[in-house]
């Protein structure tokens, strides 16, 4: 899984969703 700067910006919301589930 590669990580991009754009993903890092959405990492906060993405992490919340992944952590929530």
Curated annotation (Swiss-Prot):
PTM description: Contains 8 disulfide bonds.
Signal peptide span: none
Keyword Phosphoprotein appears in the UniProt entry: no
GO MF entries: toxin activity
Domain of life: Eukaryota
Tissue: Expressed by the salivary gland.
Keywords associated with the record: Disulfide bond, Neurotoxin, Secreted, Toxin
GO terms for cellular component: extracellular region
Coiled-coil segments on the chain, per record: none
Subcellular location: Secreted
Other observations noted: Negative results: has no hemorrhagic activity.
Role noted for this protein: Helicopsin exhibits robust neurotoxic activity as shown by immediate death (about 8 minutes) of mice due to respiratory paralysis.
Family in the record: Belongs to the CRISP family.
The protein's name: Helicopsin
Taxonomic source organism: Helicops angulatus
């Amino acid at each position: 899984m590669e990580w991009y700067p754009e993903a890092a910006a959405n990492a906060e919301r993405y992490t919340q969703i992944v952590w929530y589930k």
